[in-house]
From Swiss-Prot:
It is found in: Cell inner membrane. Its main location: membrane. Belongs to the UPF0060 family. It comes from Synechocystis sp. (strain ATCC 27184 / PCC 6803 / Kazusa). The keyword Cell inner membrane applies. PANTHER family: UPF0060 MEMBRANE PROTEIN YNFA (PTHR36116:SF1). This is UPF0060 membrane protein sll0793. Keywords: Cell inner membrane, Cell membrane, Membrane, Transmembrane, Transmembrane helix. NCBIfam families: PRK02237.1.
Length: 108
């Protein structure tokens, strides 16, 4: 269940970040307006994938925020060639701990 939930978070994150990045390319870098169509599809898929989480809405979206932080840093580093420093990674690690506690800690 944990692995599936993490997979849903990653899928949702890639769709949301990818969709946002396409808007960035279109508006800020003058790329084709057709990117807006792909963006709309990705952001729609993001909204759907998020509903697959077993947790309630508030917990799932709060935890997703931590995953979004991590994926955004990785996206910037790998796709946009941004230099990521140790404080970026530290912040991402702290966010990940929060995600793990919120989503997967044993609630007795």
């Amino acid at each position: 269940m944990i692995l599936r939930s993490l997979l849903y978070f990653v899928m949702a994150g890639l769709c949301e970040i990818g969709g946002g990045y396409l808007v960035w390319l279109w508006i800020r870098e003058g790329k084709s307006v057709w990117l807006a169509l792909v963006r709309a599809i990705l952001l729609t898929v993001y909204g759907f994938v998020a509903t697959l989480q077993p947790a309630n809405f508030g917990r799932a979206y709060a935890a997703y925020g931590g995953i979004f932080i991590i994926l955004s840093i990785i996206w910037g580093w790998q796709v946009d060639n941004v230099v990521v420093d140790r404080l970026d990674w530290l912040g991402a690690a702290i966010a990940l701990v929060g995600v793990l506690v919120m989503m997967y800690a044993n609630r007795a």
